[in-house]
Amino acid sequence: MREPGFWHRPPSLVSRLLLPIAAIYGNIAAARMQKAGTTVGVPVLCVGNYHMGGAGKTPTTLALVALLREFGETPVVLSRGYGGRLQGPVQVDPSRHSAADIGDEPLMMARRLAVVVARDRTDGAALACALGATVILMDDGFQNPALTKDASLIVVDSHRSIGNGSVFPAGPLRAPLPLQVARTDALVVVGDGAAADGLAQQITTKGGVVLRARLVPEPASVEALRGRRVLAFAGIGDPARFVATLRGSGVEVVEQRAFADHHPFTAEELAELAAAAKRDGLTLVTTEKDLARIGRAQQALGVEIVPFAVTLAFGDEAKLRLFLLDRLNGARAAKLAGRR
């Protein structure tokens, strides 16, 4: 869905008119969040958002995977598979699954590690354990109570933060903020903006950890676009951030097209993009997530679509390492004590 503009502006008449519905939605979401979950035999780390839309969960998940592997862990990502038709539980296989089957983010991540898609997260966790997981990384699912989480890391964009701070549909929040803050163990603030500073202070005050991070373009992606004029397009939570990252890397963005998050590109839309690129002598560039969703349809266009890959770099990686090790050790000690 495309986010309404009023979600990211000071409270307006529209948002105020929607507050009664937001109160009902918030009460239901809060009651659901507080339900008891199933305890899994391995640590469960959740990477989530307070709000609808994207803020960098997937790059954060992949960065955590890299660190966990350095610790000698075998992480398996568990995803709901948003946008896919399969109920699961199923291990994602990039050679036979498409984004229409299991969602764009799971497909993209499955090229790098084991990913399980399941609508029922308890069943998904069982499959992840059967695959040899020593740690389960939930990609999204912070508000879902199905599994007991040993640590919840919430990702927020430093420029957009949580918008107007209201619960859906008056604003972008998935549940009342105080409840979500209370259940947060670490806040990952992506970027160098100040919009999330107040939120970070709330997390610090309650004893949580605040981690600063930034999206760093992969050198190969920057090199592939050197000297080219590009038409950038993206169907992600914040397409403007994608364009800003391109320009910040020295890429000459001549044209840009924004689509809703998880947008299913039609053949007509792709053909129009290809025609515009050919007409103006531009190179099409998009995100890895969008390219996963486009899939084999790219082959019929007659033009190249260059994926622009980014990774998440933490400002204080030692702080993150200590946090992860503490949570992993604490989770294992608690699970061991529970078996006695």
Curated annotation (Swiss-Prot):
* Database matches in Pfam families: LpxK
- UniProt GO cellular component terms: plasma membrane
Q: What class of enzyme is it?
A: transferase
Keyword Lipid biosynthesis on entry: yes
Q: Which residues form the signal peptide?
A: none
- Keywords, in A-Z order: ATP-binding, Kinase, Lipid A biosynthesis, Lipid biosynthesis, Lipid metabolism, Nucleotide-binding, Transferase
The record's listing under InterPro entries reads:
LpxK, P-loop_NTPase
Pathway membership: Glycolipid biosynthesis; lipid IV(A) biosynthesis; lipid IV(A) from (3R)-3-hydroxytetradecanoyl-[acyl-carrier-protein] and UDP-N-acetyl-alpha-D-glucosamine: step 6/6
Residues in a coiled coil are: none
- List ligand-binding residues for ATP: 51-58
Q: Name one GO biological process term.
A: lipid A biosynthetic process
EC numbers listed for it are 2.7.1.130
User: What does the record give as the reaction this protein catalyses?
Assistant: a lipid A disaccharide + ATP = a lipid IVA + ADP + H(+)
GO terms for molecular function, please?
ATP binding; tetraacyldisaccharide 4'-kinase activity
Role summary: Transfers the gamma-phosphate of ATP to the 4'-position of a tetraacyldisaccharide 1-phosphate intermediate (termed DS-1-P) to form tetraacyldisaccharide 1,4'-bis-phosphate (lipid IVA).
**Family named by the database record:** Belongs to the LpxK family.
- Record's PANTHER family? TETRAACYLDISACCHARIDE 4'-KINASE, TETRAACYLDISACCHARIDE 4'-KINASE, MITOCHONDRIAL-RELATED
Record-given protein name: Tetraacyldisaccharide 4'-kinase
- This chain is encoded by the gene named lpxK
